[in-house]
């Protein structure tokens, strides 16, 4: 899909076959819970150390912390990856930093349409790189930086996990495409 406009590339990918998007089975509506970010820890040392251990470049980690995209939670010292609706937080995915206990989960009330993205400004680049997780997106930015490419101009979008049963276009990708088309 190189050298195609974003709408043409999406159309080509969608027409290439694969599983058809279908209406999911009707689920009972759950009461909406309000979204609130977990309290912040005084520093981000454990998050920084954990992500460095995963090979993420320190400049990229600091960029995310500085812009409010990432911080360390106070209670469990999790990485908190934040997604924004305009200038307000609307989504957060937590990833545990402890090596002996694996933890991954969305913060209650998160709106998946606004999942973690760096920087996700459609006008900056004609390319959108889509990843399942925030750490995958940060790894990609690290690879761009290592190769001397413009990581600060790359549009990266994390889908915040993708379920096997969910055959709909992920909400964050759908929102992004509507903004670009």
Regions from the language model: what does each represent?
Residues 74-176:
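Phosphate-handling DNA/RNA-contact segment within nucleic-acid enzymes
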């Amino acid at each position: 899909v190189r050298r195609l406009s974003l709408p043409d590339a999406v159309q080509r990918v969608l027409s290439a076959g694969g599983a058809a998007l279908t209406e999911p089975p009707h689920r009972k509506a759950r009461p909406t819970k309000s979204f609130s970010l977990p309290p912040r820890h005084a520093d981000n040392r454990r998050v920084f150390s954990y992500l460095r251990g995963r090979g993420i470049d320190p400049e990229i980690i600091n960029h995310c912390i500085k812009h409010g995209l990432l911080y360390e939670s106070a209670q469990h010292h999790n990485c908190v990856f934040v997604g924004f609706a305009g200038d307000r937080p609307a989504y957060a995915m937590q990833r545990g930093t402890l090596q002996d206990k694996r933890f991954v989960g969305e913060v209650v009330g998160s709106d998946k349409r606004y999942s973690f993205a760096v920087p996700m400004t459609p006008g900056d680049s004609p390319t959108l790189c889509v990843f399942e997780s925030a750490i995958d997106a940060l790894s990609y930015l690290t690879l761009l930086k290592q190769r001397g490419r413009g990581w600060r101009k790359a549009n990266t979008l994390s889908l915040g996990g993708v379920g096997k049963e969910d055959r709909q276009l992920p909400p964050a990708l759908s929102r992004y495409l509507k903004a670009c088309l």
